[in-house]
Amino acid sequence: MVRGAGPGPSLSALSHPTGASGMAAAEGPGYLVSPQAEKHRRARNWTDAEMRGLMLVWEEFFDELKQTKRNAKVYEKMASKLFEMTGERRLGEEIKIKITNMTFQYRKLKCMTDSESAPPDWPYYLAIDGILAKVPESCDGKLPDSQPPGPSTSQTEASLSPPAKSTPLYFPYNQCSYEGRFEDDRSDSSSSLLSLKFRSEERPVKKRKVQSCHLQKKQLRLLEAMVEEQRRLSRAVEETCREVRRVLDQQHILQVQSLQLQERMMSLLERIITKSSV
């Protein structure tokens, strides 16, 4: 019995898709993925070559990133530049998240490192330090001291035009963010850095307390052993004293018996002498 052909798609239709969607899928490049699938897929780990390229691209587009808060197009240009350098394709959002995470890691290490000590062994610490050293440390929103104040109209024109590299007109990067939606995240990260610093300062105190507690326990055990040894010596001395008293008592008894024998001998001699004289 042969089944009749159903209304479902034929094998040729499955193997050779037709229509606008099929043609688009066939003509489109293999690396293009839908935004939903791209958003939910697992991000690949960054290789060492990608990280070195990212440092160079970040330094190249650093001034351009500071000119505006809405810099998605700048990140896309950075992604294209990184693709030209390494041959690896990354989204602008991936580069944005990676730069944010690396900036947080750099600030955490800088907070935990003294100015006189050697820099951390993180391989990208010095490179990020050189990139972020381009901006001043203050974040009060004022212009640098080298920029003289002018009329309000000139200030408006200067704010609209791209700033020159010699006199940058952007907010400092260390504290004032160029991404408005990450302000709350940075405040949380700064509080976490402070708590981390306080924890690192509390650790030596706790360590000293534990060491002093162990030392006190050792001293207590030593004192208990010394007291027990003293008691044992006291018992031995008491036993020796009792033995000495017993020996002295026996010696006294022997001396008394010896005196009695001497008296008896003297009395016998006197009797013998009296008998011989008679």
UniProtKB/Swiss-Prot annotation:
Stretches for region Disordered: 1-27, 138-168
An example Gene Ontology biological process: positive regulation of DNA-templated transcription
Residue span, Myb-like domain: 44-129
Ranges that cross the membrane: none
Protein name per the record: Myb/SANT-like DNA-binding domain-containing protein 1
Organism: Homo sapiens
Highest rank taxon of the organism: Eukaryota
InterPro entries: Myb/SANT-like_DNA-bd_dom_prot, Myb_DNA-bind_4
Cited PANTHER family: MYB_SANT-LIKE DNA-BINDING DOMAIN-CONTAINING PROTEIN 1 (PTHR22666:SF3)
Gene Ontology CC terms, in alphabetical order: nuclear body
